């Protein structure tokens, strides 16, 4: 059986500000932005452009969901953005005003730093050690 995770839902306050952040600051590609009139919502998918999962940007449909914007994993790192050049991407992100909450560090598995997205979700920027 061959399976893969295709989409990860990320609850956002506003579609357009989230699209702007992910496409302009992280260089993600906007894969789809389709209005669904029967549900009065948009189907918005962004991707880092390589193989793997994409993000489905979803606005909350009830107050319980809204409460988790920026804290979908209870303060733990939520997503891991792999790169082939840590310092290139780190410096680019810093120049665009992205907040790093843990500075770059060499670990046995690679170089890593933790940044916050526009809502406060924590991400690892990581370049894995070549084996």
Each language-model region and where it sits:
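Short linear motifs centered on Gly/Pro in flexible linkers and helix caps
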Residues: 85, 117-120
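Conserved beta-strand-loop-alpha-helix junction that forms the acyl-donor binding cleft
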Residues: 12-15, 37-39
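Conserved active-site tyrosine of GNAT-family acetyltransferases
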Residues: 18-23, 93, 120
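Glycine/serine-rich loop-strand microenvironments at binding/catalytic pocket rims
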Residues: 4, 11-12, 18
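Vicinal oxygen chelate
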Residues: 1-7, 29-81, 90-116, 126-131
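Helix N-cap motif at beta-to-alpha junctions
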Residues: 14-15, 84-87
């Amino acid at each position: 059986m061959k399976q893969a995770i295709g989409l990860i839902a990320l609850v956002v306050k506003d579609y357009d500000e989230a699209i702007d952040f992910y496409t302009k600051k992280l260089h993600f590609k906007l894969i789809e932005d389709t209005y669904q009139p029967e549900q009065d919502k948009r189907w918005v998918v962004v991707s880092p452009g390589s193989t793997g999962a994409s993000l489905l940007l979803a606005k909350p449909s009830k107050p319980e969901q809204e409460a988790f914007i920026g804290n979908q994993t209870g303060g733990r790192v939520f997503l891991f953005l792999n790169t082939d050049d840590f310092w290139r991407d780190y410096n680019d992100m810093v120049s665009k005003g992205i907040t790093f909450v843990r500075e770059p560090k060499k670990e046995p598995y690679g170089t890593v730093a933790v940044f916050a997205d526009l809502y406060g979700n924590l991400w690892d920027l990581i370049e894995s050690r070549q084996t």
